[in-house]
């Protein structure tokens, strides 16, 4: 299987998001990479499903809460920017203050 660097990155984010979901199910608080991966995966999959950029910018800030993250993680993540593939092309989605 020959994957491009972009495809490898998407696969890595998806795998990290799966780990984050499992940890949340067990009640384990997320660290920085896990929180970013979970939100990023939500945006990428939402774009794939045909949701709009505006929808994803709003919904991306509701994926996880402060209580689901280790102390200080919400303050570390000011913005998350994801280049996602929509039905009409690739667009940049920015989520401001993604953990509230």
UniProtKB/Swiss-Prot annotation:
Q: How does it assemble?
A: Heterotrimer of UreA (gamma), UreB (beta) and UreC (alpha) subunits. Three heterotrimers associate to form the active enzyme.
The record ties this protein, via SUPFAM superfamilies, to: Urease, gamma-subunit (SSF54111)
Listed HAMAP family: Urease_gamma
Q: What is its EC number?
A: 3.5.1.5
Q: Which domain of life is it from?
A: Bacteria
Say yes or no: keyword Cytoplasm present.
Answer: yes
The UniProt catalytic activity note for this protein reads: urea + 2 H2O + H(+) = hydrogencarbonate + 2 NH4(+)
The entry lists its GO molecular-function terms as: nickel cation binding; urease activity
Q: Which family does it belong to?
A: Belongs to the urease gamma subunit family.
Entry GO terms, CC? cytoplasm
Compartment(s): Cytoplasm
Query: What keywords are annotated for this sequence in UniProt?
Result: Cytoplasm, Hydrolase
Q: Which GO terms describe its biological process?
A: urea catabolic process
Metabolic or biological pathway: Nitrogen metabolism; urea degradation; CO(2) and NH(3) from urea (urease route): step 1/1
> Which protein are we looking at?
Urease subunit gamma
Q: What class of enzyme is it?
A: hydrolase
Q: InterPro entries from the xrefs?
A: Urease_gamma (IPR012010), Urease_gamma/gamma-beta_su (IPR002026), Urease_gamma_sf (IPR036463), Urease_subunit (IPR050069)
Q: Is Hydrolase given among the entry's keywords?
A: yes
